[in-house]
């Protein structure tokens, strides 16, 4: 899976996501761009 390194900011790509209150490598939950 693709994702951002821990601590990196989301740049809006589908491979970005927010988990556990921090930008980490993981899959984006549904509506992440609205709820995040």
Curated annotation (Swiss-Prot):
Omega-agatoxin are antagonist of voltage-gated calcium channels. They block insect neuromuscular transmission presynaptically. This toxin is a blocker of L-type calcium channels (Cav/CACNA1). The keyword Zinc does not apply. It comes from the Eukaryota. This is Omega-agatoxin-Aa1b. Keywords: Calcium channel impairing toxin, Ion channel impairing toxin, Neurotoxin, Presynaptic neurotoxin, Secreted, Toxin, Voltage-gated calcium channel impairing toxin. One of its GO terms (cellular component) is extracellular region. Pfam families: Toxin_34. InterPro entries: Toxin_34. It comes from Agelenopsis aperta (North American funnel-web spider). Belongs to the neurotoxin 04 (omega-agtx) family. 01 (type I omega-agtx) subfamily. Expressed by the venom gland. It is found in: Secreted. One of its GO terms (molecular function) is calcium channel regulator activity. Coiled coil: none annotated.
